[in-house]
Structure formats: structure tokens, C-alpha cells
Curated annotation (Swiss-Prot):
Family: Belongs to the LamB/PxpA family.
One example of a Gene Ontology biological process annotation: carbohydrate metabolic process
Summary of subunit composition and partner proteins: Forms a complex composed of PxpA, PxpB and PxpC.
Pfam families found in the cross-reference section: LamB_YcsF
EC number(s) recorded for this UniProt protein: 3.5.2.9
Signal peptide interval: none
Gene: pxpA
GO molecular function: 5-oxoprolinase (ATP-hydrolyzing) activity; ATP binding
Broadest EC class assigned to this enzyme: hydrolase
Free-text function comment from the UniProt entry: Catalyzes the cleavage of 5-oxoproline to form L-glutamate coupled to the hydrolysis of ATP to ADP and inorganic phosphate.
Alphabetical list of HAMAP family matching this protein: PxpA (MF_00691)
Protein name in the entry: 5-oxoprolinase subunit A
Transmembrane intervals: none
Catalyzed reaction equations: 5-oxo-L-proline + ATP + 2 H2O = L-glutamate + ADP + phosphate + H(+)
Organism, as annotated: Salmonella choleraesuis (strain SC-B67)
Length: 244
């Protein structure tokens, strides 16, 4: 059995370099919520050195709140902003002799696109128009995955090791109780349930089915490195291969 393990990087965390030795895919911030040209270049070089698949991590234009503010923007604006960010990272990747593999939206852009078909369509179209060979990463079972499929993109359904789930398969909003899982044992058990059994227990105790093709570890999390090591060990013990 194979699973992709991804992390968001280039967001100002000192652990990026070490984290990139543990994951198979990296989502690199493109400047709209965090990062800049130099951090993108540094992360690209580190990812290439470690054989990690490189992806763009576009966001709403919201550096003050780390891309976590809800915004209502015209789909055409989201299309243009997504293209802009993908293109910026793509130029750096190409200049370093690499190949960009995927796109995963960040924060509130990701969450809103999971439920808003018009926003999801704008993102999927931007990815397709830039490079139809790119993989579009989105919340498992979401509108973003469906939009990617309509554009005939390869999609990858994502689950979260350290986030609480609602009964409908969506993530618990960050400001609500149960949104973040701080207990390592609980996060590990949830991840293994999702990967091996295709199910997740919601904060209300309801089990729901989920497709896990890639697991996210938040690089800005306090215990990201320790948990990444623990998760890799758990996968190895169960003959689950971490591969992009």
C-alpha cells in the first residue's frame, strides 16, 4: 500500500529543511499568505535535494491573517491570482532544473473551494490552463476535487492528520472546539483509520467514509517534526510506503 505524505512549507517555520527529509510532497507558499521569492527558491532547492515532489500553495491575498480570512472575490479574480502564484513558483522550479508536480490551495481559499463550486471551478481552470499535467490536491470528496475531474485533471484527495472532522466530511472551522488535534496518539489513530480503513470519526462521534490519497502534516504545527517521524515509523511498521 502506498500513501503520499505532504507538508506546507515556505511559511516562515525553521523546521522546513528537516521536514523535507520526512515527507514525499511539499506545498510551497507563493507569497500571498506567506513566503517570498527567496523562500520559494530555498524550498525548491531543498525539495529537489531530497527528491520531494514540488507543488504550489496559492492563497487568497491575506498576509496579515496567514490566508485564513474568508473572502468573496469574483471567480475571474481568483483565476488570475491562482495563475499568478503558480507561475511564480513554476519559474523558480524550472530555473532550478525541476518539475512542478501539483497545486494545493491554502487556508481559506482551500476551505471555501471545498464547498463553493464557482470558486473551485476558477482554481481548477487556472491549474488546467497553466499545465494540464499538474495534479490538483483538495479535501477528500470536495467540490474542488469534482471541479478538477471536470477539467480532466489528475486529482489527489487529501486528509488531515491533525484536524477535526465534521459529520459531512468537512473540517471543523479553526475557531471552533475540536478543530485542531494536539494529542499525538489521537492524530496517529485518526490517520491510520483514514488511510487503512477509509473512515474518519467526526467530533460528534459519527463515522464517515473518506478517501485518503495524501496526508497533510502542517509544517507550522508545534509538533510537526516529531509527529512526522512518528507517522513515518507507523507507516513503515504496517508496510505502507510513503511515495508521491
Amino acid at each position: 500500500m502506498n500513501i503520499d505524505l505532504n507538508a506546507d512549507v515556505g511559511e516562515g517555520c525553521a523546521s522546513d529543511s528537516e521536514l523535507l527529509t520526512l515527507v514525499s510532497s511539499a506545498n510551497i507558499a507563493c507569497g500571498f499568505h506567506a513566503g517570498d521569492a527567496q523562500t520559494m527558491l530555498t524550498c525548491v532547492r531543498e525539495a529537489l535535494k531530497n527528491g520531494v515532489a514540488i507543488g504550489a500553495h496559492p492563497s487568497f491575498p491575506d498576509r496579515d491573517n496567514f490566508g485564513r480570512t474568508a473572502m468573496v472575490l469574483p471567480p475571474e479574480t481568483v483565476y488570475a491570482q491562482t495563475l499568478y502564484q503558480i507561475g511564480a513558483l513554476g519559474a523558480i522550479v524550472q530555473a532550478q532544473g525541476g518539475v512542478m508536480r501539483h497545486v494545493k490551495p491554502h487556508g481559506m481559499l482551500y476551505n471555501q473551494a471545498a464547498k463553493d463550486p464557482h470558486l473551485a471551478q476558477a482554481i481548477a481552470k487556472a491549474v488546467h490552463d497553466y499545465d494540464p499535467s499538474l495534479i490538483l490536491v483538495g479535501l477528500a470528496g470536495s467540490e474542488l476535487i469534482r471541479a478538477g475531474e471536470r477539467h480532466r485533471l489528475v486529482t489527489r484527495q487529501e486528509v488531515f492528520a491533525d484536524r477535526g472532522y465534521q459529520a459531512d466530511g468537512s473540517l471543523v472551522p479553526r475557531m471552533q472546539p475540536g478543530a485542531l488535534i494536539h494529542d499525538e496518539e489521537q492524530a496517529l489513530a485518526q490517520t491510520l483509520d483514514m488511510v487503512q480503513a477509509g473512515r474518519v470519526k467526526s467530533v460528534t462521534g459519527v463515522w464517515t467514509t473518506v478517501t485518503a490519497q495524501t496526508v497533510c502534516i502542517h509544517g507550522d504545527g508545534e509538533y510537526a517534526l516529531a509527529f512526522a517521524r512518528r507517522l513515518r515509523a507507523a507507516f513503515n511498521a504496517r508496510n505502507i510506503h510513503v511515495i508521491a
